[in-house]
Amino acid sequence: AKNVIYEYNAENDVPVAIFMAHIDTVFPESVPLELTEKDGKWFCPAVGDDTANVALLMLMAAYVANEKPKTNGGIVFVMNSCEEGLGNLKGSHALNARYGKRIEQVISFDGYLDGIVGMAVGSLRYKVTVKTAGGHSFVDFGNVNAIERLSAIITELYQYKIPAGSAKTTFNVGTISAGTTVNSIAAQAEML
């Protein structure tokens, strides 16, 4: 993980409180992150998830570094990476590996929703691959098409009813890749 860490009074084996905000975004590197201003407000892809919180975290760290408050334990400010996409919280897992049992609390600033989540968030990422014989669209017409089979799986997934309760459960098919040419029956299709 490519975490950026600032430790304050966190030497030796003192207990630590971790404050973090993630520095990666859901946007691919090809998307320009251009800042614009309109009516006194700033707009930019990823400003709410999670750039504004990273700026807040840096201000907090600067305040602590300058004012040097007395603390009962260590404070760890982290701009963590590998939170979005296939990173699957790798930056957070690296913090757990580094600080382990020393961690007394973790506060993650993430997103811009008006609410506080007071529990850990679980996250699983799956890559589902469908393989079939495929073939030529004319000669092998009738062979099973991997795209059609994957589409059926996705349709069934989105029919799933989320259980009622206080915990939030979500799922998403974010990417699909399949096929090789317009005249071939797809032999492979995958989703993430």
Which role does the model predict for each range below?
Residues K41-W42, A46-R125:
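Acidic/histidine-rich catalytic neighborhood of metal-dependent amide-processing enzymes
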Residues D140-I185:
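Acidic-enriched catalytic cores of C-N bond-cleaving enzymes acting on peptides and small amides
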Residues D39-G48, G134-S137, G179-T180:
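A short glycine/serine-rich beta->alpha loop
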Residues A1-F43, Y63-N66:
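Acidic/His- and Gly-rich active-site-bordering loop/insert found
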Residues D24-E37, I103, G118-T129:
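Acidic-glycine-rich active-site phosphate/pyrophosphate-binding loop
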Residues A21-V26, G111-D114, V121-S123, I176-G179:
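Short glycine-enriched loops at secondary-structure junctions
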Residues P45-A52, F138-A146:
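Short alpha-helix boundary/capping segments
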Residues V130, S184-Q188:
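Short, flexible turn/loop "capping" segments at secondary-structure junctions
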